[in-house]
Amino acid sequence: MEGPGLEFTEAIIDNGKLGKHVVRFEAGLLAQQADGSAAVYLDGDTMLLSATTAAKTPRDSIDFFPLTVDVEERMYAAGRIPGSFFRREGRPSEGAILACRLIDRPLRPSFVKGLRNEVQVVVTVMALNPAVYYDVVAINAASMSTQLAGLPFSGPIGGVRMALIDDQWVCFPSVDQRKESTFDMVVAGRVLADGDVAIMMVEAESTPATWGLVRGGRTAPTEEVVATGLEAAKPFIKVLCDAQVALAAKLPKETYDFPVFKDYEDDVYAAVEEKAADELSRIEQIAAKLERQEAESELKARIKAELAETFPEREAEISGAFKAVMKKIVRKRVLDEGVRIDGRGPRDIRSLSAEVGIIPRVHGSALFQRGETQILGVSTLNMLDMEQKLDTLSPENTRRYMHNYNMPPYSTGETGRVGSPKRREIGHGNLAERALIPVLPTREEFPYAIREVSEAIGSNGSTSMGSVCASTLALLNAGVPLRASVAGIAMGLMSETDEDGKTKYLALTDILGAEDALGDMDFKVAGTSEFVTALQLDTKLDGIPADVLAGALKQAKEARTAILEVMNEAIDSPDEMAPTAPRIITVHIPVDKIGEVIGPKGKMINQIQDDTGANISIEDDGTIFIGADNGDSAESARSMINAIANPQMPEVGERYLGTVVKTTSFGAFVSLLPGKDGLLHISKMRDLNDGKRVEAVEDVLSVGQKIQVEIAEVDDRGKLSLVLASDEDDADE
């Protein structure tokens, strides 16, 4: 793009023999009324516009940073018109929501603490090469526009996608390259003062091809391999951050003097600590979540009342100080004594239980419980034509495996809104979905659309990883032949820096909800007994040393192995499919026979479905999936399809239960098989009229009536002459 005031910088991403990419940052021309705006290009033909705007005054009566990130997918970016009724974009797609989360997670902690002005980042996909993914480009675009907005922001942030292809980590892989990779991850980070890169966010998974590639000799994405991928991402992140810094230097902007609201002042903290510390130390040793929370609430209310006169109109500060004292107590006990809130050690897992087949009539169900976290998994199977059709900018057009996650308010003992899923629920469902996709059977091996629903009916730490475990159990209970069982665990981290600047780190296995809130890291790892299938990392620290992260991964592997043992005791192989589940069989026909099976205006396929009660789905390659409530209906439909696509000439003497399809003055045409009719002459109908001559066919037969007939003659042209098959003949046979 060219124009007055336009400035740009470029970052070169060099993957050696596997290709080079150019990320171009532009600013100064578009969206000039936003506080900060930038256009970011990937290889010249993918373009995203990001605009960051901040409210001029802080919001009243809130105790959080009101940051909103929106990703707008414009279908014109791919040269398409939206397929909706109104032919315009509506609510954001799931892919856009997930992209929002990818941006928000590293962006939010980079703002100064205590900011209360509303900040909105809007990223619009303007042009998209279908061979690339736009989500990581969006991270860089959002960072660039925010860097230029004059906000108290400690960026810039660089975001990259890394794929493991033939033992090499490739940055910004294409869609086709990702299909050949064994592991794929999005990594975001920023450059520290010493030049090192701090990893702030990771979203990663094995690919659908991983299982086959590993069996073929490729490197499995083990914990050690994943750790090398994070290190491989750092140089690319630095290149992207350097380009953003260079562009910001060309368009300097003073940081606005935004009011920053401290959670509390020192005098309030000292008073709260004096009054609450001893009793809080006792309360934070109560293992039961609800009992502990009730005790905390009672103590906080009492402290507020006692300090109300001393600190009038500073109730919010008292609450903030109370939380800070609680955090200090919990962290000190964990770091000094190695004892957690519920009495466990750093590596201990809460009590586990697993059970399958707990809900009647559904195709598969399971209950997985870890401490007070309780997840109900329910599996549903159906025809492939029920897979989700996607009209988005995603390279995927359909989704065969659909994973939905629900977390009702009662799961935490609270009231609240129920209904359409929030961004968090969509993100958790997607994480569990990605954890299971690598072990799902192929369409050819298991021709079903699969929907998995995870109901988080009790929550106290990592319901998303509990959903992975419950889903594995439910899918096996439904008869899905998984390649391996998958389990997940959430890891935490607490750290402390001494006077000499040395930092002590302690990784925690199976964190509670409180440990997540009071800790420094949320690290979710899912996988089989052999390799990692998905992971998600968010940290509040400037960075995590490689050895600490490697240790946490190893600790997660130990926990995952223990959980898999409990799950395997409940079910370790696919059950028989439920009687209520559809039976699907596969037929392969020549491609040139597809039209005959469908028939004019769908007449033939509709007739087969009406006659058998089966549901039929035809693929472009001639694969036909036949689904029915019982095996007999499916087999009947298969026989009728084979009769059309692979016809065999009927022989004299063969009997059929046929259907009258047409009556004439000289007889009735009877359908024996799809595409095979025979003539029952009027002279052969005496048995239908007590042995008397039939004057009109309509007197004894009507269209749609079923009759037992026998082939009496096949002429040279293949036309069939029929006679009635008598009950006596049937009895003789």
Curated annotation (Swiss-Prot):
Ranges of residues in domain KH: 582-641
Cofactor: Mg(2+)
Protein's UniProt keywords contain Zinc: no
Gene3D superfamilies assigned: GHMP Kinase, N-terminal domain (3.30.230.70), K Homology domain, type 1 (3.30.1370.10), Nucleic acid-binding proteins (2.40.50.140)
GO MF annotation terms: 3'-5'-RNA exonuclease activity; magnesium ion binding; polyribonucleotide nucleotidyltransferase activity; RNA binding
Primary location class: cytoplasm
EC numbers, comma separated: 2.7.7.8
Enzyme class per UniProt: transferase
Domain S1 motif: 653-725
Keywords: Cytoplasm, Magnesium, Metal-binding, Nucleotidyltransferase, RNA-binding, Transferase
One matching Pfam family: KH_1
CDD domains: KH-I_PNPase (cd02393), RNase_PH_PNPase_2 (cd11364), S1_PNPase (cd04472)
InterPro entries in the cross-refs: ExoRNase_PH_dom1 (IPR001247), ExoRNase_PH_dom2_sf (IPR036345), GPSI/PNP (IPR014069), KH_dom (IPR004087), KH_dom_type_1 (IPR004088), KH_dom_type_1_sf (IPR036612), NA-bd_OB-fold (IPR012340), PNPase (IPR012162)
Any one of the GO BP annotations: RNA processing
Similarity section: Belongs to the polyribonucleotide nucleotidyltransferase family.
PANTHER family: POLYRIBONUCLEOTIDE NUCLEOTIDYLTRANSFERASE, POLYRIBONUCLEOTIDE NUCLEOTIDYLTRANSFERASE 1, MITOCHONDRIAL
Name of the featured protein: Polyribonucleotide nucleotidyltransferase
Organism: Cutibacterium acnes (strain DSM 16379 / KPA171202)
